[in-house]
Amino acid sequence: MALTLGTKKKVCYYYDGDVGNYYYGQGHPMKPHRIRMTHNLLLNYGLYRKMEIFRPHKASAEDMTKYHSDDYIKFLRSIRPDNMSEYSKQMQRFNVGEDCPVFDGLFEFCQLSAGGSVASAVKLNKQQTDISVNWSGGLHHAKKSEASGFCYVNDIVLAILELLKYHQRVVYIDIDIHHGDGVEEAFYTTDRVMTVSFHKYGEYFPGTGDLRDIGAGKGKYYAVNYALRDGIDDESYEAIFKPVMSKVMEMFQPSAVVLQCGADSLSGDRLGCFNLTIKGHAKCVEFIKTFNLPLLMLGGGGYTIRNVARCWTYETAVALDSEIPNELPYNDYFEYFGPDFKLHISPSNMTNQNTNEYLEKIKQRLFENLRMLPHAPGVQMQAVAEDSIHDDSGEEDEDDPDKRISIRSSDKRIACDEEFSDSEDEGEGGRKNVANFKKVKRVKTEEEKEGEDKKDVKEEEKAKDEKTDSKRVKEETKSV
């Protein structure tokens, strides 16, 4: 893996072991189990030693209504497979039922996804990390009052709203094969967020993302859409991504970046029609890292789950500036990766319908739009008091050397590059059979959820402190 030499970044990684238990239903292409596979693979590559691992706080309904409508979130909290008949009109109104089915633990799944992304943004705001990773996030199709494209709560919008408390300008980059419509819609009329999406366009879900969709009002020219055809390969993708993102960075001058790393743009994806390899996909991560800005990396689409796990493991390694071998280590889901048991995939022989002339024409049109931007728009920032969330740094010094350290403390420790000893816990964990999904329990009462949250969340992410912080910055959020 060829990486640019330089100062290594501090990386924080958010993961909840329960996320793999949620199940959209038989035959549904969205499989949260892919997040567990990714986690297990990067553990067995030893990447956990080089980053801080956190279990995210579950986002509350109040957190979600920073963007989503109250009645929509109330509906998501209430709906269950056993009471769907009572909500038939609301299911139709909120677009829940087919692509976005009702399943056991739906709201808790949304809480984990959104909680990880918002917590990642808080970490970046507090300058406690350079890169924050939440592969459970990136659900870019969800709208203010509507589920869409397997997405219910738009964790990306919630995370960007959090970043805007401390950053004047945030750029959102989407390399999922599908247009990032939900995020674009949320920020379509503001000049504080630029949305940049590289996606398949033309008789393809969600049908938006035309080159001519450029934003409106104050947000005019702050939406960038690179509409692509079938079969784009690594070489063509790199040839458009780097110049477009260089121009965006030059003209917009963001102080934070959100990168949605949807893996359905890979070759061989169950729902995709692009021809990128994992290395080609990861070149986007490598390039964005070179701008040395606070970076939030999120998941997204990806429906050939063995390749999703490969991709996001490799991109975690890229974030860490770590070289990992192509030979996959043995892991709990090793049989999924046969017959080759390698990390990297080969492109197919599909035709690249994106001619050089077509790509150049689109690129020049986008450059014309970007030239219409005023350089680095100004914004009046309100002073925000220091967060009251506690910092856990220094905890290691308080450990009793005669006692075994907790899993939580162990996760927070980052090993030096020269440290090769194996953890005594290495190799423990998950199941091998994806078919044996554990059914999660009913949606719990508010009192039960609050009790669980207090146990699960790290000191720095307690619900009490987050609520205090959200009230203090409410006016700033509303102004976006």
Curated annotation (Swiss-Prot):
Recorded coiled-coil stretches: none
The entry's keywords: Chromatin regulator, Cytoplasm, Developmental protein, Hydrolase, Nucleus, Repressor, Transcription, Transcription regulation
Recorded catalytic activity of this chain's protein: N(6)-acetyl-L-lysyl-[histone] + H2O = L-lysyl-[histone] + acetate; N(6)-acetyl-L-lysyl-[protein] + H2O = L-lysyl-[protein] + acetate; N(6)-(2E)-butenoyl-L-lysyl-[protein] + H2O = (2E)-2-butenoate + L-lysyl-[protein]
Single Gene Ontology MF annotation: histone deacetylase activity, hydrolytic mechanism
Domain of life: Eukaryota
Oligomer and partners: Part of a large multiprotein complex that also contains RBBP4.
Name of the protein: Probable histone deacetylase 1-A
Species of origin: Xenopus laevis
